[in-house]
Amino acid sequence: NYEFARTAIDMALGRGGDQAVVKNGEKIQYYGGKSQQLEKTTRVKARVKAHALRELLETKDRLLIMGHKIGDIDSFGSAIGVYRIAAALNKKASIVINDVTSSVRPMKERFDDSSDYPDDLFLTGKEAAELVDANTALVVVDVNRPSYTEEPELLKLVKTIIVIDHHRQSSEIIQNA
C-alpha cells in the first residue's frame, strides 16, 4: 500500500500537484486541479520530439553523443539510451567521454567488456573531433551549457546539434541546437 500511495503522490505532483489521485483496482482516477490534460499533453510532446529526433538522425551517417564534464550516472545513462536509439536506426554512434569518474567507471567497464558493443563505443573528445564531417550529428545529453559539456570544441565543429536535457536553461546556451 505504501508503494501505491507513493506512486499516487508522484503522479499528482507530475500533473501539477493540485489534485488527488485515487487507485481503484487497476483504474486510476484524478480529482480536482486544472492540470488534468498535462499528462496527455506531455505524452504528445514527447512523441512529437521523439519523431523529430528520429527524422533528424535518419538524415545523418554518424552520431556523436556527449554529456557533461565530471560525468555522473544520469549523463552516462542518457548517452547509452541515445546510443541504443541510434543502433535501432542502424546508425554509427559513439559516446564522447574524456574522464571517467568513479561513479561511472563500473558501468563503463561492463560496456567495455561486453561483446555486444563495438570497440569504438567510447571516444575521447579528440578522437571524436577527427571523425566529424558534414554527415555527423551531435546529441548533447543532461547538460545545456556549452562550458559544461565534455568536449566544448565539438559544438564548434558539428553543424547539426540536438540537446536533450531536463535542467533549467541559463543565459549560457548551446548555439545552433
Regions found by a protein language model. Give the residues of each.
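Catalytic/regulatory signature loops of cyclic-dinucleotide turnover enzymes
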Residues: 3-29
